[in-house]
C-alpha cells in the first residue's frame, strides 16, 4: 500500500516536472520567436527608411545625365530604363570620352578599370552614341543644304525641282558592305549580345541610328542583312574578321573602337585578332579599353592599340563599393544552447 502511494507520488512529480519542462520550452520558443520578429522588424524598418531616404535624395537632384551633356534622345532612353543619376564610372568616363573637358581639343583614349555591375557598359555606349548622333546630324544638315542648292539651281533655270533619291535596301543592286562608325569588341557571344541589347535600348529615340550584333552561332545571311546601314557594330573578334574577309563589312570608316573586358579577351586568346582589327582601324579617332584590372599585360596591350603607344591615354580606376542587396531577407536566430542550435 505504502509502496503504491510512493510510486504514485514519484509519477506525479515526474509528470509535474515534465509539464514544467514543456511550459519552459514553450516560453523559450515564444521568446525566440519574439526576438526574431523584433530583429526582422528592426532590419525591415531600417532598410525601408534607407530606401526612402535614397529615393528622396534622387528626386531632389537634377538629372545627372543632362548635366553630362548627353543628347536629349539618350537622356530620355536612360530615364525610360529608370535611371536619372550616373554611376561613378559613368560620371568620370562619359565627359572624357565625349571630348567635353574645358581644354579638350581632340578625342582622348581611355583605359577604365571597373567591375561588372558598375555601369561600365553605359559608360562607353552613351558617349559613342552621342558622338554618332552629332555626326549624323551634321551629315543630314549637309544633305539638306545640298538638296536646297539643287532646288534653287533648278528654279533659276526654269526646270522642275529634283526629287529626293531613296534607295531600297532590300534590292540586291543597292547592297554595299557595311561601314560602321563605331565598333565594340567583346570576348564572348553572350556579352556581345547583352551589350548590343543595351545599345538598342539606348537608341530607341534616335532616328536613323542603327545597331548590329555580329557573333558566332548566327546564320551569316541574317547577320549580313542586319549589318546594312549599321552605325554601331558590337562583335566578337572571330565572326567580325570572317565577315570582313568576305567583304561584308569594311572597317576603314571606324572612328571609335571599344575593347570591353580586355583581360578576358587576352585570356581567350584573341591577342592576334585584336592586332588585326587594330591595323584595319588605324584611322580611328578614339580607343577605349575596359578591364577589371590594370595588370601589366593590359598595359602592354594598351601600348599596342592606343594612339602614340598609349602616351596620352587617360586612366580611370573605380574601386568596387560594398554591395547592397535589398532583395535579401535577413533573419536573426539566437543559438544559446543545444536545443536552439538544433533548430538551425
Locations of the language-model features?
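Conserved nucleic-acid-binding Ia/Ib motif block in the N-terminal RecA-like helicase ATPase lobe
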Residues: 79-83, 138-245, 253-256, 315
